[in-house]
Amino acid sequence: IEFVTFKTLVNEYISQWTGKDDSYYLRSAFWLSAFNDKPIKSIKPRHIEKVLAKYADGKINGYGSNMPKSNNTVLRMKSVLSSIFQYAIDKNYLDKNPATKVRIKAVPNQIERFLSEDERERLLNACKEASWDRMHLLVLLAITTGMRKSELLNLRWSDINFEDGLATLNTTKNGEKRINPIPTVALDELKQHREVGSGLIFFSRYNLDKPIDFRKPWFIALEKVQITDFRFHDLRHTAASYLVMGGATLHETGEILGHKSEQTTKRYAHLSTGHKSALSERVMNKVFKNK
């Protein structure tokens, strides 16, 4: 086949894709907006690198917030495109995959951003006034449980054990089921929205079986209280910081957050310094007072 547009390729690829990760569709749509009716044989590594560079710098509207992206986020975006082109090769539309020659320029991952106590209260108050009535619930759950955005958006009422204050996460980043505790402050608000059945808690008003796109009320809330350089994912970092500074060990924190690697949790090690100092002070003072 001499002439196949990128749009035709993506539509064909998506129609046969059987994965469960909804973000895959969003990333495919991102690439569709970048190349659209461009013939696939005319797309070169330099074209892909240009798009990814702008995406990494947060200069492209569309998928995700308009903020600098981490290396891993950029690599995931590239991976989707590579899979699309691999499909084209399998269908004999292409001989080579232009995405395989693209190199991601290494940049330091963004420093984790945590909400201060004042920022947290201002943000939660702004979310109470959002046009979407579950904005406050979503943010409160993110802060108090440390769940990922995808885990929250895939939560169903049938996943919530109100009696024990637990959520069963069937759709996690690591592909493993996880039981997550829900603190009383969040559980009480969940009860206010409680519905019978197994529907999504955070559903789209256009399709009850699809998660809501909450970016607009989220960004409005951030802008309203003038909180800058903050991503929704940073609510997870905020939850981790509260756990560690509250005395949870790094292992316990990793268990709650669902980290597969202890190395991931070690990024919060510096936050436990104060807790360790207080613990050492308390124990040693007790030891030497007994002498």
Where are the language model's segments positioned?
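Basic/aromatic-enriched alpha-helical hairpins
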Residues: K7-M67, I84-Q86
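Short basic/aromatic active-site micro-motif
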Residues: I43, R134-H136, T228-G247, A269
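C-terminal secondary-structure termini that scaffold catalytic or DNA-interacting sites
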Residues: D57, Q192, S198, S204-L208, ...
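Basic, Lys/Arg- and aromatic-enriched nucleic-acid-binding interface segment
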Residues: N61, M67-N71, L75-M77, D90, ...
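Catalytic-site neighborhood detector that most strongly recognizes the C-terminal catalytic loop/helix
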Residues: F114, T171-G175, V185, L257-R282
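DNA/chromatin major-groove-contacting recognition/catalytic segments
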Residues: R122-A126, R178-T184, D188, Q192, ...
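Short, polar N-cap/turn motifs at the start of nucleic acid-interacting alpha helices
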Residues: D159-L166, D229, A248-R267
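Active-site/catalytic core of tyrosine-dependent DNA strand-transfer enzymes
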Residues: D164, P183-T228
